[in-house]
UniProtKB/Swiss-Prot annotation:
This is Chaperonin GroEL. It is an enzyme of class 5 (isomerase). The gene is groEL. It comes from Polaromonas sp. (strain JS666 / ATCC BAA-500). Its main location: cytoplasm. Belongs to the chaperonin (HSP60) family. ATP binds at residues 30-33, 51, 87-91, 415, 479-481, 495.
Length: 550
């Protein structure tokens, strides 16, 4: 086992903060409408130019092990915020840096880190409550477009295309992002359906880049029981193989010998097949299988209606233009079902919604309507070069996550204003002792950081702007894009509540861990110089022995 360095107390925390600052300083230059670009080196090909905070954070790995630990902890803040809310990574990083910087002063002054942490937690809980109170539901297409634009670094075209996509497939609909073929971004709406079940074995994957199985023009077999015996399936497999088309099997379960045989046939290239578990449970599973049958123009093979697997013909199978099966979900695009049958099915489910007694049942039935009627929207991102395409695609994905978050939990005023208003509303939080009070105070000071950074990146004087915004009320804030003050929501500067909330909670969580750190253990650096000097000496000795032998 390699030797370890153990560093304690102030020195450990100081080195960790150095790492935090290096990462946060690189990430925060991208914040706000006048944020700058960061260029990332690639081992081959052109470098990547980005304004996406989490992309910058993911690239950073520091040489000094202790600094690197600090940097990695803040990187965790960015990626966790990105995973949950899809945006707000730069805000989260700026907040984490500010809380750590303020907190370290108190720790150095001899305050109890555990009480500081309790104070921080109290402040964050109060601020999150205030954010939820201030939150406003997103209802109009215009608001959705504004959220998308802000998240895509003030690109209005991206906001508009996402709002159009949501208009077409509904807020619950499925929206995917692909590389386009032209200079302009385009929106395609495809009749389709998504359900939350993925492939039963990773050996079915035929697109390693997307880690998914893609079937073009496949047959779809729907069965409401388990398949464990391959003999039951053989007649169907032979017919499909003769037709030379792929097959998607959706059943309660495919296991044992049946699954093994399907995997072997796929690996040998004899048959392109993917097996997926049927979505839902109990009666809901049967209903969802019927939905898929309606969409693909097939039948559910069920023993209760006198059908069995051995007697299946190609006419009983559904078909679709394309099916994508990922690890956790399956998208059926352009099923061959008749439009009038799908309409009738949707009407039938809508009647059930009206008759439903529980909220849970109603919600599940509404999901089914969205899946049947909604379809899949595909945003094709257009750009002049591949470098621009990658950067733009990342921004579109960010914006899509942000708009979903806005639909889920509503919106608050953007540009760092919501946090300042929450601070004013939560001004009366009390701690149990002086150290907890200090923890509360440091959070209330740190939440000015996002606005300060936005102003700094726009070339303004941060303190002047913060004071002016604090003097205002409601959604009054600073628009850094054109250096004006006014109502942020009217100016279209919005943030999803979920993004602001997640950024604050994750930043405070990791910052608290850093403040309560007392020791760090890292691998000791290897002594390169000593080892290098020994080798030539040894070799020289051997040469001498040869001379003696002569």
């Amino acid at each position: 086992m390699a030797a370890k360095d153990v560093i304690f107390g102030g020195e450990a925390r100081a080195r960790m903060v150095e790492g935090v600052n290096i990462l946060a300083n690189a990430v925060k230059v991208t914040l706000g409408p006048k944020g700058r670009n960061v260029v990332l080196e690639r081992s081959f090909g052109a470098p990547t130019v980005t304004k996406d905070g989490v992309s910058v954070a993911k690239e950073i790995e520091l040489k000094d092990k202790l600094q690197n630990m600090g940097a990695q902890m803040v990187k965790e803040v960015a990626s966790k915020t990105s995973d949950i809310a899809g945006d707000g990574t730069t805000t989260a990083t700026v907040l984490a840096q500010a809380i750590v910087r303020e907190g370290m002063k108190y720790v150095a002054a001899g305050m109890n880190p555990m009480d500081l942490k309790r104070g921080i937690d109290k402040a964050v809980t109060a601020l999150v409550e205030e954010l939820k109170k201030a939150s406003k539901a997103t209802t109009t297409s215009k608001e959705i477009a504004q959220v998308g634009s802000i998240s895509a670094n003030s690109d209005e075209a991206i906001g508009k295309i996402i709002a159009d996509a949501m208009d077409k497939v509904g807020k619950e609909g499925v929206i995917t992002v692909e590389d386009g073929k032209s200079l302009e971004s385009e929106l395609d709406v495809v009749e389709g359906m998504q359900f939350d079940r993925g492939y039963l074995s990773p050996y079915f994957i035929n697109n390693p880049e997307k880690q998914s199985a893609i079937l073009d023009n496949p047959f779809v077999l729907l069965y409401d029981k388990k398949i464990s015996n391959i003999r039951d399936l053989l007649p169907t497999l032979e017919q499909v193989a003769k037709a030379g088309r792929p097959l998607l099997i959706i059943a309660e379960e495919v296991e044992g010998e049946a699954l093994a045989t399907l995997v072997v046939n796929t690996l040998r290239g004899i048959l392109k097949v993917v097996a997926v578990k049927a979505p839902g449970f109990g009666d809901r599973r049967k209903a969802m299988l019927e939905d898929i049958a309606c969409l693909t123009g097939g039948k559910v093979i069920a023993e209760e209606v006198g059908m069995s697997l051995e007697k299946v013909t190609l006419a009983d199978l559904g078909t679709a233009k394309r099916i994508e099966v990922g690890k956790e979900n399956t998208i059926i695009i352009d099923g061959a079902g008749e439009a009038k049958d799908i309409e009738a099915r949707v009407k039938q489910v809508r009647v059930q919604i009206e008759e439903a007694t529980s909220d849970y049942d109603r919600e599940k039935l509404q999901e089914r309507v969205a899946k049947l009627a909604g379809g899949v929207a595909v945003i094709k991102v257009g750009a002049a070069t591949e470098v621009e395409m990658k950067e733009k695609k990342a921004r579109v994905e960010d914006a899509l996550h942000a708009t979903r978050a806005a639909v889920e939990e509503g919106i608050v005023a953007g540009g760092g204003v919501a946090l300042l208003r929450a601070k004013q509303a939560a001004g009366a939080i009390k701690g149990d002792n002086a150290d907890q009070e200090a923890g509360i105070k440091l959070v209330l000071r740190a939440i000015e950081a996002p606005l300060r950074e936005i102003v700094y990146n726009a070339g303004g004087e941060a303190s002047v702007v913060v004071n002016a915004v604090l003097a205002g009320k409601g959604n009054y804030g600073f628009n850094a894009a054109n250096d004006t003050y006014g109502d942020m929501i009217e100016m279209g500067i919005l943030d999803p509540t979920k993004v602001t909330r997640t950024a604050l909670q994750n930043a405070a969580s990791v910052a608290s861990l850093m403040l309560t750190t007392e020791a760090m253990v890292a691998e000791a650096p290897k002594d390169e110089s000593g080892a290098g000097g020994g080798m030539p000496g040894g070799m020289g000795g051997m040469g001498g022995m040869g001379d003696m032998g002569m």
